[in-house]
C-alpha cells in the first residue's frame, strides 16, 4: 500500500518516517516537500491563491502515483488541502484531524498552542468544526508562542522548548485539554512531567488513523 505525504517543511519528515516504520511498516511513503508554502503563509498571514494552486498541483501529482491515501502534513495549509482533496480519487487525511477529534472527546475547554501565527486560526477552526460535526459545544482558547518555530529552525532547541512549555502550562490552567498545533512540538512531550491535563500532538494520532483507514 502507498501513502503520498505533502509537507511544507523537512522538519517533519524524519519523525513521520519513524512513525510509519513503527505503526505501518508495510506502507510505502512517498514525500512531496515544498518549504515555500509555509513561508508564503507566514508572510501573508493566510493561504493565498498561489498556495491553493500549488496544493492542487501536488494532489494531482499524488494521484499519478496511485496512492491509497494522500496525507497533508501542515496545519497552516489545511484550508488549501481541503479544497484540493475534493479532486482526490483515494482517501485523504489532514495530520491534525484525529487530534481534533480526540480533543473534543476529552473536554469542552480546549487550548490550542501554536508556534506559527498562521496556524492558530486553521487549528482553532478545525477544533470548532470537529465539535460541530460531533454535536458537541466547545470553548477554544488560542495561545501563540510567536517566533518559537524560527528559534527551533535556527537550532536553539532548548529556548524553543522553554518558551513552548511555559505557554502549555498557562493553557493547562485554563482548559480541560491542550492541543499542540505544530507537529514539531512533539519532542516536548517527555519534558511535561508536571502537566496533569491531556496534551495532544498530531503525528502519532494521524499515523494511527492511516493504519485504520487502510484497514491494516
Question: How would you name each of these model-derived features?
Answer:
Residues 1-216:
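Non-catalytic structural scaffold of enzyme domains
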Amino acid at each position: 500500500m502507498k501513502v503520498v505525504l505533502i509537507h511544507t517543511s523537512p522538519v517533519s519528515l524524519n519523525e513521520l518516517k519513524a512513525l510509519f516504520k513503527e505503526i505501518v511498516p508495510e506502507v510505502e511513503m512517498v514525500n512531496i516537500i515544498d518549504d515555500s508554502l509555509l513561508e508564503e503563509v507566514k508572510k501573508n498571514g493566510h493561504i493565498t491563491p498561489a498556495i491553493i494552486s500549488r496544493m492542487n498541483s501536488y494532489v494531482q501529482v499524488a494521484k499519478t502515483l496511485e496512492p491509497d491515501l494522500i496525507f497533508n502534513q501542515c496545519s497552516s495549509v489545511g484550508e488549501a488541502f481541503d479544497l484540493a482533496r475534493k479532486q482526490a480519487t483515494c482517501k485523504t487525511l489532514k495530520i491534525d484531524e484525529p487530534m481534533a477529534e480526540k480533543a473534543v472527546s476529552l473536554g469542552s475547554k480546549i487550548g490550542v498552542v501554536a508556534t506559527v501565527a498562521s496556524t492558530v486560526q486553521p487549528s482553532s477552526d478545525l477544533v470548532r468544526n470537529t465539535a460541530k460535526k460531533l454535536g458537541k459545544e466547545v470553548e477554544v482558547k488560542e495561545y501563540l508562542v510567536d517566533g518559537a518555530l524560527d528559534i527551533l529552525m535556527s537550532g536553539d532547541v532548548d529556548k524553543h522548548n522553554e518558551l513552548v512549555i511555559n505557554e502549555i502550562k498557562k493553557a493547562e490552567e485554563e482548559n480541560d485539554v491542550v492541543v499542540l498545533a505544530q507537529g514539531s512540538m512533539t519532542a516536548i512531550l517527555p519534558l511535561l512531567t508536571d502537566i496533569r491535563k491531556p496534551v495532544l500532538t498530531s503525528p502519532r494520532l494521524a499515523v494511527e488513523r492511516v493504519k485504520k483507514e487502510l484497514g491494516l
